[in-house]
């Protein structure tokens, strides 16, 4: 989890720096939270598909709502500030990529390696 969080935080920060280089006031953690949700959803696909689908669908719906209702949406009212939905999107994408890489790495590690007897 910690390594995934670090990679997600770097992904969000670098993406915002590249995509929105005029944004100098963002201090949130929400992009990382979306990234962790996407990461957990992806890595759970193999052993808990129902849970994974639920997490991914609801995360996707919230991302859609945030991107459509920019400015004075419900999330902005809750936190008393503008919502930087781009951080949510980049966090979720980064988290999903990290999850896919973890699944691929786990799949490669779980393959049976030939022994000396083979």
PLM features: residue spans?
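Hydrophobic alpha-helical transmembrane segments of polytopic
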Residues: 5, 51, 55-58, 91-98
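C-terminal transmembrane module of polytopic alpha-helical membrane proteins
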Residues: 47, 66-118
């Amino acid at each position: 989890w910690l390594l995934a969080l670090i990679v997600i935080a770097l992904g969000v920060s670098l993406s915002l720096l590249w995509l929105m280089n005029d944004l100098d006031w963002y201090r949130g953690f929400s992009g990382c939270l979306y990234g962790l949700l996407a990461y957990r959803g992806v890595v759970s696909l193999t052993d808990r598909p129902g849970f994974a689908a639920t997490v991914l669908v609801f995360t996707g719906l919230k991302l859609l709502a945030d991107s459509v209702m920019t400015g004075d949406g419900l999330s902005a009212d809750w936190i008393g500030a503008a919502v930087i939905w781009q951080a949510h999107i980049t966090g979720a994408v980064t988290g999903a990529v990290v999850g896919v890489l973890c699944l691929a790495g786990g799949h490669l590690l779980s393959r049976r390696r030939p022994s000396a007897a083979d």
